[in-house]
Amino acid sequence: MTAPRTLVLIPARMAATRLPGKPLLDIGGVPMVVHVLRRALAANIGRVAVATDTPAIADAVRAHGGEVVMTRADHPSGSDRIHEALQTLDPQRTIETVINLQGDFPTIRPEQIGAVLAPLDDPAVDIATLAAEIHTEEESTNPNVVKVVGSHIGTTRLRALYFTRATAPWGDGPRYHHIGLYAYRRAALERFVALPPSPLEQREKLEQLRALEAGMRIDVGIVDSVPRGVDTPADLETARRVLAG
């Protein structure tokens, strides 16, 4: 069901080094960022817009009927970009919740996008995100797979204690692959972007640690699978096969 006080923002820019022009790469005749936009719209949880500093991305999104907000080019992170976009799109401050959806998740399921809102039913939670259980040793030890360590709240939610590229936690039991999809309360996003980068954030190269180090609460919804991001040519070919199928 559409939530009029929720805004889904998809930050998109041309900065990828391994896949130049990534947001506009063709998947079945449609730019990748448009696939993400369509999946966000299919989630039917609120207004959806692409936030970009690149006119070519804006033109492509508008050509497919999507909403665009232009942002500055010098933002240090996607969170800063969506904060500027929020201020531009909603100066009346009617939006209460902002979802930050990466523009390189063309195969994400609409229900997964909606699932990120569930932890915010608890008023003590500042930021919500998602994770899925890890099932292979390769995934568990891969430093490009971010692991979330947390305390269970029931069977489908964690309270995040730490995010790391290391294999963690130690010992027997499940480990969880963090999915880079966030839902912020508006006040939490505003507080987050005002904070300086934190020591652990800089050490792990994980922006979400800034919030934890500042005492903000991040809860994690557990979903059944990790949506496949597109970071390499092989990822792109996989996405093309999935979306052609």
UniProtKB/Swiss-Prot annotation:
Keyword Oxidoreductase part of the UniProt annotation: no
Keywords assigned by UniProt, alphabetized: Cytoplasm, Lipopolysaccharide biosynthesis, Nucleotidyltransferase, Transferase
Intracellular or extracellular location(s): Cytoplasm
Major site of localization recorded for this protein: cytoplasm
Functional pathway: Nucleotide-sugar biosynthesis; CMP-3-deoxy-D-manno-octulosonate biosynthesis; CMP-3-deoxy-D-manno-octulosonate from 3-deoxy-D-manno-octulosonate and CTP: step 1/1; Bacterial outer membrane biogenesis; lipopolysaccharide biosynthesis
Pfam families: CTP_transf_3
Entries under InterPro entries matching the protein: Cytidylyl_trans, KdsB, Nucleotide-diphossugar_trans
GO BP: CMP-keto-3-deoxy-D-manno-octulosonic acid biosynthetic process; lipopolysaccharide biosynthetic process
Reaction(s) catalysed (UniProt annotation): 3-deoxy-alpha-D-manno-oct-2-ulosonate + CTP = CMP-3-deoxy-beta-D-manno-octulosonate + diphosphate
Top-rank taxon: Bacteria
Free-text function comment from the UniProt entry: Activates KDO (a required 8-carbon sugar) for incorporation into bacterial lipopolysaccharide in Gram-negative bacteria.
Protein name: 3-deoxy-manno-octulosonate cytidylyltransferase
Organism annotation: Rhodopseudomonas palustris (strain HaA2)
Originating gene: kdsB
